[in-house]
Structure formats: C-alpha cells, structure tokens
Regions:
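Contiguous mid-protein beta-loop-alpha structural module that forms a pocket-lining wall or clamp
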Residues: 56
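As written
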Residues: 47-48
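Non-catalytic positions within long, well-ordered alpha-helices that form the structural scaffold/packing
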Residues: 43-44, 175
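Long, charged N-terminal interaction/targeting segments
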Residues: 18, 40-41
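Active-site pocket-lining/capping segments in soluble small-molecule metabolic enzymes
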Residues: 1-33, 52, 60-181, 187-244
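Conserved nucleotide-cofactor-binding alpha/beta core module
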Residues: 35-37
C-alpha cells in the first residue's frame, strides 16, 4: 500500500525503475537538484514523478523550476532551516565524522550534549562548543551552521541563527506558482511533533483551497507552531531572504 518511494541514490532509482516499474518514485531533497535541468534528467533517466527542492531557493527560482519541468515539485513548509544545499554539506561530517547523506541527519543525536555551566547552558556537537545560552535565551539544537562563533574579535551567529523555517504566510503564492506538495520535516522528530505541525498545516491548506484570495494566517496556528519552533523564532529562509 505504499504510495511512493523517496530516493536519492541513482543506483537505487535504476533498480526500482527496472524491478518495480509500477512504483512511483520521488527524488529526495538529498538528491540536491536545485534546477529544472537536473530534475528533468532524473525524470528522463529514472521516471521520477516528484522532486523535493532544497531549502536554498528563492520564490522566483522555484517558480522558474515549476514552469520548466513536468515533474511535480514539493517544497519545505515547516521545520529545521538548512542553509546549505542538502546532500552537499560537509560541516557536520567535519565535526562528527558522520555524513548527513549516510546517517540521514546533520547533527546526530549521539553527538549532541547539553551542559549547564556558570557561563550558561552550553551545547556541544561531538565535544565542540556550538553555542552558549544565557538564562533568558531559548536553547537551540546544536547545529554547526547555527552556532555562535568568534569572528574578527566579535561573537555572533556567523551563518544563521537558531530558528525554524515557517512558510505558512506563503501558502497562496506557493499554490499560485504550481507547487504540488508541502513537506513537513519529520526526521529526528517525535510523532507528537509531526502530528501537531501536520494538523496546523492541514487546516491552513484547506483554508487556502477554499478561499486563496482572502487567506490569512490565524493566531491559533502560529501559537501551536511556536511551541515546536527552534528558539521560538520563525523565518522564511531563502524564500524571501538572501543569505548573509
């Protein structure tokens, strides 16, 4: 009863296409396909019917991809914010020795440590200090690209702050440009997290489908999403903001 298989490995795609031609194949975000030429290649070679875009594309770029491929396009709507091209980030592998493409996550739970010190709550990844939070600050999950580091004698978030991607306000626009599905991050998340976020997004999508022109984000939705947002902060990520 499986609806589709999500794959990133070309060898597995070829095997699935040959041995199970009736099976619907989706290209994983780990396939790092950021343009329509790459997506069309996977479609022509392996029959991919849907592709999940990495979280580094702006809205005009997403629209350009949608217009130039017969493949359904899926984008991330809520969850962790990855500022790298998924499948190609070497930061976490450098610190933990585990590649995101082989272990499935960029900060494996086994490498994560929280320690209360006199200076504040410290978060470490494989022993490396990633951040230190004051009592008044919300403690984020230790991800290397969201660490607070000393650069030119200043300590700050050099790449990105601990925050969650939330594109709820973009729903009408995503529908308008032809995006076919919204992806909610579930990897390293609890069933309760997935249920809570999915419930909010189901209500929002149904509301937008009924009346896209007058769609507005409800306070109750944001209140629920705030409970599971990293650092209680939201961002539109690359959709409407260039990286530093």
């Amino acid at each position: 009863g499986v609806d589709a298989i999500i794959l990133a490995d070309p060898g597995l795609m070829e095997y699935a296409k040959t041995k199970h031609p009736q099976l619907r194949l989706h290209l994983s975000v780990q396939g790092s396909a950021t343009n329509y030429e790459a997506i069309n290649f996977y479609h022509e070679q392996f029959g991919i019917q849907r592709a999940v875009l990495p979280r580094v594309l702006a809205m005009p770029q997403i629209e350009h991809v949608v217009k130039n491929t017969p493949v359904e396009i899926e984008v991330f709507g809520f969850g962790g914010l990855c500022v790298m091209v998924e499948g190609r980030c070497a930061l976490s592998a450098y610190v933990t020795g585990d590649s995101p493409n082989t272990v499935g996550v960029c900060s494996p739970g086994k490498a994560v440590r929280y320690e209360q010190t006199a200076q504040g709550m410290e978060t470490r990844l494989n022993g490396v200090l990633i951040d230190r939070f004051a009592e008044s600050e919300k403690t984020g999950y230790p991800t290397l690209c969201k660490g607070r580091f000393e650069v030119n004698d200043e300590t700050y978030y050099a790449i990105e702050e601990p925050t969650s991607l939330n594109t709820l306000e973009l729903l009408p626009k995503l529908m308008e440009i032809g995006v076919k599905a919204i992806k909610i991050e579930g990897r390293q998340r609890s069933p309760a997290y997935v249920a809570q976020v999915t419930k909010v997004w189901r209500e929002a999508i149904d509301s937008a489908l009924r009346n896209r022109q007058n769609f507005s984000v409800r306070e109750a939705w944001m209140a629920e999403l705030n409970k599971v947002s990293e650092g209680n902060m939201h961002t539109l990520g690359a959709y409407y903001r260039p990286w530093k």
